[in-house]
Amino acid sequence: MSLKLVITGASGHIGTRVCQLIGDQAHIVALVGSAEGREKAQAAGAAEVHVVDLDQPEGLAELFAGADAVCVITAGDAKPDRERNALEAAAKAGVGYAVKLSSESVTLAEGRPGEPDPIAARHSANESDVQRLFDRFAIVRPTWWASLDQLPFVKAGLAQGQFAWPRRDTSLAPIAPDDVAATIAALLLKPSAGTRVLSLTGPETLTIEQIAGHYAAALGSPVEVPDLTPESYVDWLTEHTPMTNEQAQGTSAILTPFADRRDAPVSDAVETVTGRAPQRFTDYLAANFSPESLTQK
């Protein structure tokens, strides 16, 4: 009998990849939030698709009946109750294993003074839900995506010949979305006993200057890295993007814990779980980035 896997957020950019990678190796039940999401999940290969409102927990448990695992993938700015309702419904239905897509921001928020940024706070709350409800689970904490140029504020900067970050003298280890999805798919298809919390990164640490240089090579034109602080980065955002001051402060709060860490670590978790090395940033750009993408909405 094949595995039965229930995936929330199966219509998003990671969820669809997970469905495609699993294919007919398991019976996928996709939970999506709209008719458009239904079409995307079906096209990605989900065997069953249900349009549900995760804010309304009534009736969710029956969708998890007989499932071997639940995978929760929701937008970083979603309210904690959405994942909590899905996880509690899965546990109530007797599902024994959970995989959660979290964020490295949780790692960086641990031990930092003050309140964590909203994304770290939400993921931290839902990680606690996973740990409370399941004896077997895997939590994956990817760092920044290699698709940095898809972030509106990065795209706006690149279109103006700049790659702005709260600090110039720092680094990232960007990870390709395909590698995140491949790790999640492998964890679902071959669940291990016990619990795992995995930090996911790309294969190399790149300085902000190096990242800008790779974009410059892809664009065929210079990309400047302005010398900013978290405070002046807020001013940069309000000047170079449509963000309000409040939105800019929120964005700076999310990025600053990463910017304060000068040397981004590299993890071998992707290769350990999937059996292959993660994609290099330059290879990701060659396959996925073009100058024309900066003018596309």
Regions found by a protein language model. Name each.
Residues 64, 68-71, 99:
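N-terminal Rossmann-like NAD(P) cofactor-binding module of classical short-chain dehydrogenase/reductase
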Residues 47, 68, 96:
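Conserved acidic residues
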Residues 184, 188, 215, 255, ...:
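Hydrophobic "lid"/C-terminal helical patch
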Residues 51-52:
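Cofactor-binding loops of NAD(P)H-dependent oxidoreductases
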Residues 269, 274-297:
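Amphipathic terminal alpha-helices
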Residues 2-41, 55-58, 65, 76-84, ...:
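Oxidoreductase cofactor-interface core, primarily capturing Rossmann-like NAD(P)-dependent enzymes
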Residues 214-260, 297:
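Terminal hydrophobic/aromatic helix or amphipathic segment near a protein terminus
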Residues 209-213, 230-235, 282-285, 290:
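An amphipathic alpha-helix signature
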